[in-house]
Regions:
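N-terminal flexible/basic segments that precede or flank functional cores
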Residues: 1-44
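Residue-level detection of the helix-turn-helix DNA-binding "recognition helix"
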Residues: 74-75
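DNA major-groove recognition helix of helix-turn-helix/homeodomain DNA-binding modules
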Residues: 80-98
Length: 100
């Protein structure tokens, strides 16, 4: 039986090899979320970036537990606004309103 990587693993590997692409990826995922409101896709993308940046490092910087971050960004996650904001700050971003 062959072992295959999941798409999430493939994305994470890509960003490990191309960290310079993360900024544009974050911009795109929030643009897409603004258009379609697909929270699961947004959380999955943030989960990928968080894995690349390091869940432990993010936990230390945010004061959230590793488990709390993983739960917030899980497929069934329903994170608090403060959690998403803290995670974004830890990976070098901020939420900023923009007129539609």
């Amino acid at each position: 039986m062959r072992n295959y990587r999941t798409f999430d693993e493939f994305k994470a590997d890509y960003f490990y090899e191309h960290p310079e692409e993360i900024d544009e990826f974050i911009t795109i995922i929030f643009e897409e979320y603004a258009k379609d409101g697909d929270i699961k896709a947004l959380l999955a993308s943030l989960r990928t970036v968080s894995r690349v940046k390091g869940i432990t490092a993010i936990a230390e910087e945010t004061g959230l537990s590793r488990n709390g971050i993983q739960k917030a960004l899980s497929e069934n996650g329903n994170p608090y606004f403060e959690s998403i904001n803290a995670i974004l700050h830890a990976i070098g971003f901020r939420l900023m309103p923009q007129r539609i």
